[in-house]
C-alpha cells in the first residue's frame, strides 16, 4: 500500500481503500518528513541555480523556510489545536497576497516551476502576486525550459484542470511565461480572431 516516488523530493504515497453501500473508494495520502534548506554545493545545484537534489532532513522551522509561498508554510498541530505560522502566512491570506519566502530571484532559480505555481495559485485563489515576487519572473522565464518535461507536463496539467484554465493562461501571458509551454495554443492565440475560440474551449474545460 506504500510507494516511494520522486527523485529530487522523495515522498511516500499510502493508499487507503474504503467502501460504502454503493461505491468503493480509493484515497492516496501523501506522507513526507521535514526537510531543511540545502547547503550550497555544486554537486547538487545546476549552473543555472536549479536544485537537482535536496533530500536534506530538518526540523519544522527549517521545513517552513524551504517552502515556496508564505501561505504554504503553515502547520496544524492537532495536539494543541494550533496553527504554526512561521512566515506570516495567515496575514497574507487575509490580505489575499501571494508572497515568496526569501529572495524571489534565488527561489525561482532553485526551482523554476515555482513561477508556474505562483500563476496557478493566483488564478485559483484570486490573490494578488506580491510585487517583489512578481518582478523577477519575466527575466527568468527562460529557465522554465531547463525543467524536465515530465515536471512541466504535471504542472501544466494542474493549471489547466484547476477550474481556472483561462484565467491561468491569461496570467501566464501577462507575466511572459506562456511562449513554448503550449505550442499549439500559442499558434491559435497568435491568429486574429482565435482568442475567443480558445477562451470558449478553456471555459468549457473549467465546467
Question: What residue ranges belong to the model's regions?
Answer:
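Catalytic cores of the polymerase beta-like nucleotidyltransferase superfamily
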Residues: 1-207
Amino acid at each position: 500500500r506504500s510507494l516511494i516516488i520522486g527523485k529530487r523530493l522523495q515522498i511516500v504515497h499510502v493508499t487507503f481503500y474504503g467502501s460504502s453501500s454503493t461505491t468503493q473508494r480509493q484515497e492516496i495520502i501523501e506522507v513526507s518528513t521535514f526537510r531543511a534548506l540545502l547547503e550550497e554545493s555544486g554537486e547538487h545545484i545546476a549552473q543555472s541555480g536549479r536544485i537537482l537534489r535536496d533530500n536534506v532532513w530538518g526540523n519544522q522551522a527549517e521545513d517552513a523556510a524551504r517552502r515556496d509561498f508564505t501561505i504554504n508554510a503553515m502547520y496544524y498541530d492537532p495536539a494543541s489545536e494550533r496553527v504554526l505560522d512561521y512566515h506570516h502566512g495567515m496575514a497574507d491570506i487575509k490580505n489575499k497576497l501571494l508572497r515568496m519566502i526569501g529572495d524571489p530571484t534565488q527561489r525561482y532559480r532553485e526551482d523554476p516551476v515555482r513561477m508556474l505555481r505562483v500563476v496557478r495559485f493566483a488564478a485559483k485563489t484570486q490573490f494578488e502576486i506580491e510585487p517583489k515576487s512578481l518582478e523577477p519572473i519575466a527575466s527568468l522565464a527562460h529557465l522554465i525550459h531547463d525543467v524536465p518535461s515530465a515536471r512541466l507536463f504535471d504542472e501544466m496539467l494542474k493549471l489547466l484542470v484547476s477550474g481556472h484554465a483561462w484565467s491561468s493562461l491569461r496570467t501566464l501571458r501577462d507575466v511572459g511565461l506562456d511562449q513554448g509551454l503550449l505550442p499549439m495554443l500559442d499558434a491559435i492565440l497568435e491568429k486574429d480572431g482565435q482568442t475567443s475560440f480558445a477562451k470558449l474551449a478553456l471555459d468549457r474545460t473549467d465546467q
